[in-house]
Amino acid sequence: YFDRMLLLNLLGSYRMNIALFPPLLGVLGMIAAFVVYLLVMRYPDGEDKVKKIGDQIHAGALAFMKTEYKYLTVFIILLVFLSQVFLGTETAIAVVVGAACSSLAGFIGMYAATKANVRTATAAQKDGGAAALSVSFYGGSVMGLCVASLGLIGLG
């Protein structure tokens, strides 16, 4: 009897430790996304004219995101209210956390992508298509890492 109880206690502790893996891996993924972003930012961003156009694209994208998030906030508030009324508090909290993580991933992805665009154009101009593909791949991977990592954090 004692051996079985000890084994069950050990297994229970083991399961609790396994439950920590998804959020822990999510945090590691966010760190990896930040490192990849820093690597992308090390690529040259071109001459003054290219920088100016890139800055305008970046500003326009962020203005678009700001407007989009205003409209989404209204929808999310409505969805949270309906979730609370019909499905309960836990579901409403899950909707809030999911919407926040999705919004954060979208913002980080848009920010990184618009910064990578000008570097991709500069790499294509100076070093050719292979270099441009490399820069654009890393720029896009920031978004992918954020989506996957925030999803893992949300499982915690």
Model-derived features with residue positions:
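Short, Lys/Arg-enriched N-terminal segments with co-localized hydrophobic residues
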Residues: 1-15
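Hydrophobic, small-residue-rich transmembrane alpha-helices and their short perimembrane loops
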Residues: 16-156
